[in-house]
Amino acid sequence: MSLIHPTSVIIACVLAIAIGGCARTISQVDVPPPPPPIFDVATPSIEELAAAINRTDAVRELSTNSARVDVLSMPAVPKLTASMHLRRQKSFRLRASLPIMMGTGLDLGSNDNEFWFEVPEGMSQTLYYAHHDQYSAQLDRAILPVDPSWMIQAIGLPRLDANKVSRDGVVARRDGMLEVRTLEPSPAGTYQRVMLIEPSAGYVTHLFLYAPDMRLVAKSIASKHQYYDTVDVVLPHEVKVELFPASGPPLAMQMEIDRYTVNQLLSGDPQLFVMPTTARRFDLVQLAGGASSMIGNRAAVPPSRPVSQYSAKAELGTKLR
């Protein structure tokens, strides 16, 4: 019998990977100085904002052995301890342990071609996998509402392409934050991503992703930011994430990290980014067909609406616990 529902574990795994973030190896004992201001105007231009956010391009590799993961939507699951290794653009590996399972844990990763999640089910391990391009083409029917590679960028290493910004440009919100909406084309239609940015130091604090039918499919809240002058980036040490699958309840997770190592992998394993050869395995693209049939009885989704206007009154979304 499975100890945890596999779909929930899969989504929990991708959330855990997504919120890895990055920074130099550092202890949390001393309170770091606040990020320095970089804007000398109330509302910077799109180009200035993009330059500030895209400072994360300086991070090519990162590792941590001090992550703690709390699956908020699955209170029966204890906190996980995890190690994570990431190399631009799509290579990552995360191993997380469940104390109550006596060493049996989660193994998930990605390379340029595919991503995978190996999870414990009963006395054996089960591998779920997919090719990036095939999975991205079926996001409207997939078990996970976002591609894991998008999650890594959105939560840990955000980027802003000035050419994708909607006609509203940079909006100064009444709560003091800056807001930017980008249009993200995909085989499943055009998604909309909303960023909330700290107005002085120019780092992302909130991200919202809307499907072509304007459903909210993912959001994140990053906090405990620190500035690292050696790489000139501002990085969060705590992130909360929530996903909204097409069927099933929302999935929420929080991750806290004490220390990071940037631009160096804390592993000498030559197979670090190679998918395991687990015998029991399932293709997530094929499983998406089953998910599609499960949601086939829902009311028809109306055609995609035009890009909505910005509003400085926009809600930040329901707070996670």
Language-model regions, residue ranges each:
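Bacterial N-terminal signal peptides that target proteins for export
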Residues: 1-11
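Flexible, processing/modification-adjacent segments and terminal tails
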Residues: 46, 120-194
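N-terminal leader/targeting segments and the immediate start of mature chains
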Residues: 22-78, 85, 139-145, 162, ...
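Non-transmembrane domains of secretory- and envelope-associated proteins
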Residues: 23-37, 174-176, 211-321
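Bacterial N-terminal signal peptides
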Residues: 9-20
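An acidic-aromatic
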Residues: 24-26, 90-150, 284-285
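Short helix-loop boundary/capping segments
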Residues: 186-218
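Extended beta-sheet lipid-handling architectures
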Residues: 62-66, 77-79, 89, 96, ...
